[in-house]
A protein has these predicted regions:
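SAM cofactor-binding core of SAM-dependent methyltransferases
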Residues: 34-110
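Short, flexible loop segments at the rims of nucleotide/cofactor-binding pockets, characterized by
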Residues: 27-32, 48-51, 116-123, 141-144
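P-loop/Walker A phosphate-binding loop and immediately adjacent motor/lid segment at beta-alpha junctions
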Residues: 11-13, 65-70, 91-99, 161-166, ...
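Class I SAM-dependent methyltransferase Rossmann-like catalytic core
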Residues: 10-48
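Short, charged, surface-exposed secondary-structure boundary motifs
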Residues: 80-88, 109-112, 174-180, 195-199
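C-terminal substrate-binding/active-site "lid" region of AdoMet-derived donor-dependent transferases
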Residues: 130-135, 139-218
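Surface-exposed interaction regions that form or flank ligand-binding interfaces
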Residues: 104-132
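Juxtamembrane luminal stem/stalk of type II transmembrane Golgi/ER carbohydrate-processing enzymes
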Residues: 2-9
């Protein structure tokens, strides 16, 4: 049953995980990346033993169907998370090590965006939630949902091994470039960038730079 406080609606269109619409009468999530980015993501997914997704959809379906990786996908839109989980079952590609985890950030609107600023006290749980899962240490992270800068900070602060981060929409959204006060992208693939994160301790100045990232909902 959908949470009555969630404001998500599904208009008549095809459900696309990263495309212009998240509504459909027929639920069929696809990877809505441009061709170069799509190929790059698929290649990285096939090589990874464990994947963390911030934002779920076509990439989750691809991971479940085409890889043997452990997958944790964080989703702020409860109705979308439930529909995606049901889709994996219907397609016969659900497995115990593929999890779509709804994160309660309060009421949401389109694309799982926060619906009420008064719920800000929950927002930090979205980037931090997967790092409390016992035994989960992702090799690859796709940042393609909400709170993207905070998600990058969470990887930096919690990763236990070298971790590749794919950050979508980075090149066309200048707000995200604030992270370059702390680290630089290792590669650019169309609108996406790749970061290579190593486990390390950070100094106070770096923490001070990262703190505002947790207040950005983009």
């Amino acid at each position: 049953m959908t949470d009555p406080t969630t404001t998500t609606t599904f208009p008549d269109a095809t459900f696309d995980s990263d495309g212009p619409d998240r509504g459909a009468a027929s639920f069929n999530p696809v990877m809505w990346f441009p061709p170069a980015e799509k190929q790059f993501v698929q290649t990285c997914y096939r090589m990874a033993d464990s994947i963390l997704e911030y934002g779920s959809g076509g990439s989750t379906v691809f991971a479940a169907r085409e890889t043997s990786a452990r997958v944790v996908s964080i989703e702020s839109d409860r109705a979308w998370a439930e529909a995606l989980s049901a889709h994996l079952v219907a397609e016969g590609i659900d497995r115990p090590d593929v999890a779509v985890n709804w994160c309660d950030i309060g009421p949401t609107r389109g694309w799982g965006q926060p619906g009420k600023a008064s719920s800000w006290g929950r927002f930090h749980t979205y980037p931090l939630q997967p790092w409390s899962i016992p035994g989960f240490s992702p090799e690859l992270v796709l940042i393609d949902g909400r709170f993207r800068m905070a998600c990058l900070a969470a990887v930096m602060l919690h990763c236990q091994r070298p971790t590749t981060v794919l950050f979508d929409d980075y090149t066309r959204r200048k707000t995200y470039h604030a992270v370059e006060q702390v680290l630089q992208p290792n590669a650019r693939i169309g609108r996406m960038v790749r970061f290579e994160i190593e486990p390390k301790d950070y100094d106070r100045a770096t923490y001070a730079c990262m703190l505002p990232w947790f207040f950005s909902t983009d």
